[in-house]
Swiss-Prot record:
This is Acetyl-coenzyme A carboxylase carboxyl transferase subunit beta. GO terms for cellular component: acetyl-CoA carboxylase complex. Acetyl-CoA carboxylase is a heterohexamer composed of biotin carboxyl carrier protein (AccB), biotin carboxylase (AccC) and two subunits each of ACCase subunit alpha (AccA) and ACCase subunit beta (AccD). A zinc finger (C4-type) spans 32-54. Its cofactor is Zn(2+). Pfam families: Carboxyl_trans, Zn_ribbon_ACC. It is an enzyme of class 2 (transferase). It comes from Geobacillus thermodenitrificans (strain NG80-2). Belongs to the AccD/PCCB family. GO terms for biological process: fatty acid biosynthetic process; malonyl-CoA biosynthetic process. Pathway: Lipid metabolism; malonyl-CoA biosynthesis; malonyl-CoA from acetyl-CoA: step 1/1. The keyword Secreted does not apply. The gene is accD. Disulfide bonds: none annotated.
């Protein structure tokens, strides 16, 4: 024991090595934010990005959404080359746009076009939250307004899937103007009898929820979608009250009369086809409400 006091101690210690874990390539697996289950992304995509364990509706890329609701091969895109600029000279904005284009494969946060759904022709707009969180800038507003005007000219219904964090701050008042522009286009469309179906997905917030997203003849939503204008914390601080746990969810809005239905993604195409069939009239009225 006393000898140990004079023995020079080692300056290092052996650390047992952990067995090497096989590396999983990025994107192969997806973790559900609700139930925390990890699943193959391929299986999730096959299930329309609905969690196989708990039914949570994961965000769906715009082109996957279009494939899931329109008849195969019927989609024809509008204004595919339209891209945002930096009108206010906002620092770093162009670089962020370019990064999102590489990541998402899209030029902007919305894809618009026309196609058929169970044989019914329509114009469609699908927002994608992977591009600038689906925020609405000048190009998003312009593409949606143009799609509405084409639906008006060709006497087709207009269908939109919304997913957005609201107006795009890097474009200032120009982004806020899109609320009025899109709403005005829809008002002209509606006055002439046009059928507008809005499907709100997670999340639909800010200026998008306060404008075109809520103007549908039919306002639908996916289960669990967050829908609202201001954030929960801001509202609680303003009204000085604790809000219900399910506040601003699709189910809460349905219960309070702000939605017509909450529809599971697996049933959405069928339900939309029923609505279109109900309103598909003959003669000059065509595909109109009247």
């Amino acid at each position: 024991m006393w000898k140990d006091l004079f023995v020079k101690k080692k300056k290092y210690a052996a650390i047992p090595s952990e067995p090497l874990r096989p590396e999983v390539p990025e994107g192969v697996m997806t973790k559900c934010p609700q139930c925390k289950k990890i699943m193959y992304t391929k299986e999730l995509v096959k299930n329309l990005r609905v969690c196989l364990s708990c039914g949570y509706h994961h965000p769906m890329p715009a082109r996957e959404r279009i494939e899931s609701v329109l008849d195969e091969g019927s989609f024809r895109e509008y204004d595919a080359g339209m891209t945002s600029v930096n009108p206010l000279g906002f620092p770093g904005y162009i670089e962020k746009l370019e990064a999102d284009r590489r990541k998402s494969g899209l030029n902007e946060a919305v894809v618009t076009g026309e196609g058929t759904l169970e044989g019914h022709p329509l114009a469609i707009a699908v927002m994608d939250s992977s591009f600038r969180m689906g925020s609405m800038g000048s190009v998003v507003g312009e593409k949606i307004a143009r799609a509405v005007e084409r639906a008006h000219e060709q006497r087709m219904p207009f269908l939109i899937f919304t997913a957005s964090g609201g107006a795009r701050m890097q474009e200032g008042v120009l982004s806020l103007m899109q609320m009025a522009k899109t709403s005005a286009a829809l008002k002209r469309f509606s006055n002439d009898g046009g059928l507008f179906i809005s499907v709100m997905t997670h999340p639909t917030t800010g200026g998008v929820s306060a404008s075109f997203a809520s103007l549908g003849d039919y306002n639908f939503a996916e289960p669990g979608a967050l829908i609202g204008f201001a954030g929960r914390r801001v509202i609680e601080q303003t009204v000085r009250e604790e809000l219900p746990e399910d506040f601003q969810t699709a189910e809460f809005l349905l219960k309070h009369g702000q939605l017509d239905a909450v529809i599971h993604r697996h049933e959405l195409k069928e339900k939309l086809a029923v609505v279109l069939a109900i309103h598909a009239g003959g003669g000059e009225s065509g595909w109109w409400r009247n």
